[in-house]
A protein has these predicted regions:
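C-terminal output helix
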Residues: 107-116
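Short, conserved "switch-loop" micro-motifs in signal-transduction and mechanochemical regulators
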Residues: 85-86
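Two-component/phosphorelay signaling modules centered on CheY-like receiver
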Residues: 13-30
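Acidic, metal-coordinating helix/loop segments flanking the phosphotransfer/catalytic sites
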Residues: 30-49
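Receiver (REC) domain active-site loop signature in two-component systems and cognate sites
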Residues: 56
Length: 125
């Protein structure tokens, strides 16, 4: 897929910086946790790819994923889980809840871009 607007949800500013460098020509929307992500999605409903951390304050990634998949429009947007080593259970749960793929931290930029290229385009409503 060729994303046109990406939402990055992670409580690490370093991760946001890395994604900005990885996708310099793609507008990124940044959120620090699940609640912040819901606010940002209200402001930017046209995102077509989401990178989602699992362990965050206020609302974790799995809770947010449930909300995204319950929404008729947002359920079509591919979600890529970004998780740390040793959190395989959370990754498996995320895939069971409908995430399209996962990336383990630390990750290589080339591997993430390659993964995004293999994702299918979001289904049209």
């Amino acid at each position: 897929m060729q994303p046109t607007k990406v939402l990055v949800i992670d409580d690490s500013k370093l991760i946001h910086t890395m994604f900005s460098a990885m996708f310099p020509k793609v507008p990124l929307v940044h959120a620090m946790d699940g609640m912040d992500a819901l606010r940002r999605l209200g402001e930017h409903p046209e995102v077509d790819l989401i990178f989602l951390d699992i362990n965050m304050p206020q609302m974790n990634g799995l809770e947010l994923l449930d909300r995204l998949k319950a929404d008729e429009v947002l359920a079509r947007v591919p979600v890529v889980i970004v998780s740390t080593e040793g959190k395989e259970q959370d990754t498996v749960r995320g895939l069971q809840k409908g995430a399209a793929a996962y990336v383990k931290k630390p990750f290589r930029s080339e591997a993430v871009r390659e993964l995004v290229g293999r994702l299918p385009e979001p289904a049209l409503p």
